[in-house]
């Protein structure tokens, strides 16, 4: 219990630390342009501030510039912490029980319900971007977090893990191919700055085909290995490892774990009779007990107590409004847990997007840039922690599957709101996408996918610090170019606010 509690508080401490560093990314060494026009063809037009779709807030623009902006930064960090708590403690456990009740296989469960747990903030942000702000913050958050997931999380796994993990070829190839197709589809959709109903349906179809492939993953894997292994050394080695290595195993400490043959983002596994339930989720490895400790138990360490006190209002609010389905008494109420936690995620994400939008407007940073930096890294914090934890245990395939595979669900996060708005709300009229810079970002994303696969290949299919350094430098380079393009420093994509 103490080990699990220590990991939980360490995860939240890491969350706050990374968020604090990320919050300063757009400001370091950058001279912001002053309300310049965005070029669109032969004319220029201003971009209406998304903050007009939100309440006015509790400070004027001048008060925010005089120091009130710090309050907004603190609220942003606190909302990230709240989303992390509700996902870890309520949303994911309810999704696991739903998958168990429906009898879903680990592949289907991992790419549907379980992937929804990790991508819930991105999904809500996409809905807010389409229906509330009517801007690009949802799209840029998903595309920005995708680049971070591919290169940033891989860099964290390589640099923070003392174990060199051997990777399998097929799962990485499968997920990279699926995401390359998805990203290429998004590029084609947003290229003309309009999204039609059939284009939103196309993204849903791609995701459905991906789930269908996972349903027959074993047969497809065996067929491809049989056909391609004579000419592909990595596939031949993958076949040898799959024959030698069982799915379930035991660590030196006597604790059961899932071996790297598990190639999905997450899944639910049961040991033979006489053993406890073992659950692997997108937020890490944890031994699930029937009756977890009370959320009101104060940690012993001083630093943990500080974080516990800071999060106590959120803990109390969730405790009073959402049943904890991890406990035996509330297990049958998992549907209520699912809907209540989804409501709270939506509420916290709304406040988060509101604060980030006003912060970006105060600092004269476009909403797309904020989505590429603060929102992108923040919504991927749980994935970062989960991947680093499994990489430290030598389970490289599981870490890479979390890195690449979960991004496919993010395409669904764009397809659902686009399809609903264009097919049922706008009367078949297209939805407008205002940012030409997103085209550049999507191209960068496709390049990063190909680069990651080639980097792993030339590194000998190993997840180590050498790969981590290469991915880190690549991510910093792509992120810098994307931000400079959105700011108008490079290219012809300068932005100004209407009425400014």
UniProtKB/Swiss-Prot annotation:
Q: State the annotated membrane topology for this chain.
A: Multi-pass membrane protein
Q: Which InterPro entries match?
A: K/Na/Ca-exchanger, NaCa_Exmemb, NCX_ion-bd_dom_sf
Family the entry assigns: Belongs to the Ca(2+):cation antiporter (CaCA) (TC 2.A.19) family. SLC24A subfamily.
Q: Tell me where it mainly resides.
A: Golgi
> Could you tell me what this protein is called?
Sodium/potassium/calcium exchanger 5
Question: What's the disease link here?
Answer: Albinism, oculocutaneous, 6: A disorder characterized by a reduction or complete loss of melanin in the skin, hair and eyes. Patients show reduced or lacking pigmentation often accompanied by eye symptoms such as photophobia, strabismus, moderate to severe visual impairment, and nystagmus.
| Residue numbers on the Extracellular membrane side | 30-66, 133-136, 191-195, 324-333, 390-399, 459-468
Name any one Pfam family assigned in the record: Na_Ca_ex
This entry carries the following GO cellular component terms, namely:
melanosome; trans-Golgi network; trans-Golgi network membrane
Native species of this protein?
Answer: Homo sapiens (Human)
Q: Which reaction does it catalyse?
A: Ca(2+)(out) + K(+)(out) + 4 Na(+)(in) = Ca(2+)(in) + K(+)(in) + 4 Na(+)(out)
Q: Where are the transmembrane segments?
A: 67-87, 112-132, 137-157, 170-190, 196-216, 303-323, 334-354, 369-389, 400-420, 438-458, 469-489
Signal sequence range? 1-29
Per the UniProt entry, what are the Gene Ontology biological process annotations, in alphabetical order? calcium ion import; calcium ion transmembrane transport; intracellular calcium ion homeostasis; melanin biosynthetic process; monoatomic ion transmembrane transport; monoatomic ion transport; negative regulation of melanin biosynthetic process
**Residues exposed to the Cytoplasmic side:** 88-111, 158-169, 217-302, 355-368, 421-437, 490-500
Entry keyword set: Albinism, Antiport, Calcium, Calcium transport, Golgi apparatus, Ion transport, Membrane, Potassium, Potassium transport, Sensory transduction, Signal, Sodium, Sodium transport, Symport, Transmembrane, Transmembrane helix, Transport
- One MF term in GO for this entry? calcium channel activity
Superkingdom: Eukaryota
Q: Where in the cell is it found?
A: Golgi apparatus, trans-Golgi network membrane; Melanosome
Q: What does this protein do?
A: Calcium, potassium:sodium antiporter that transports 1 Ca(2+) and 1 K(+) to the melanosome in exchange for 4 cytoplasmic Na(+). Involved in pigmentation, possibly by participating in ion transport in melanosomes. Predominant sodium-calcium exchanger in melanocytes.
